[in-house]
C-alpha cells in the first residue's frame, strides 16, 4: 500500500461504481452539466450550495422532524396506505373534499399524467417549468412569450394572445416558474371564467402561491371554486414552500370525476411511501409553524430584493 503526500490537490477515494460515478462528475472539465443532470441527490456533494430548487429553508421545524425521527423504525418497516387514504389526508390538510384530490409522488407524477392524457393543443407561457412541455409532442404546444425584458404578463395578455388559437387547454403557473410573474386572485378567477366560456381546460399550478403576500387569499384551491369550474385542474407541489422535496409529494385537485378517475388509474396503489404519508398525517399540528415560516421567507425575499437593488449595475426583476 503506497501513500502519496497531498497538499492542495483535489482527490476522491474510489471503491465501487458509485464512487466512480461521483468522481467523474467532480473531475469533469464541465462540472455543472454532469451534476445538474442527476436532478438531485446533492448530499453526495457536501460543499455544493444548491440555488436551483426553490425550497423553504424555515420549514419543517425541528419538532416536526423529531416526530418523524421518533417513528422512523415503525415507518420503514410497514407498508403505506393506498390512494383513498392519501386523498383523505390531503383533503383534510387543504380543506377540500377527498373525492376532489389525488396525491402524487411529487407534482411531477401528476404533471406526467395530465400532460400525456390531454387531447388537443395546450397553451403555455414561456419560459416555463420544463416538465410541462417535455411531456407533450412539440407540435401540440402553442406558446406565448411576453414581449418585455421582465417576462411579465397579465390575464388579459393571455386572453388576447390565445383568443384565436386552437387550444383545448391553457396552463398557468402562478406565481410563474422561473419568471416569478404573479397574477392576483381576481384576475385568475376572470381567466378561469374566460376559459370555461371558451370550452378550454384550465390547468393552474399553484406550487409557489404560499410564497406570495396574503397567500391564503390568492389560491383557487377551494371547494366552491372547484365545484363552480368543473374544467379547472389545480396542481400543487408539496416540496417547495413546505421544504420537503425528498418526500416527493404533490396534489391534483378538480371536481371533474373523469380526470380524478383517470389520474388514479395512472398511479400505483402505493405511489406514496410511509414517511410521506406520515408527514401528511401529522402536518396539521404544525400548520401555524408553516405559515410563520412562509412569512419569514417573504421577509427574507424582500430583504434580498432591497440589497440587490442597491447594486448599481444590477436590474432586479420584480418577483
Label the predicted regions.
Residues 1-6:
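Catalytic donor-sugar/metal-binding loop of nucleotide-sugar-dependent glycosyltransferases
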Residues 22-78, 165-166:
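N-terminal "arm"/small-domain region of PLP-dependent enzymes with the aminotransferase-like
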Residues 80, 91-113:
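Short loop-beta-helix segment that forms the pyridoxal 5′-phosphate
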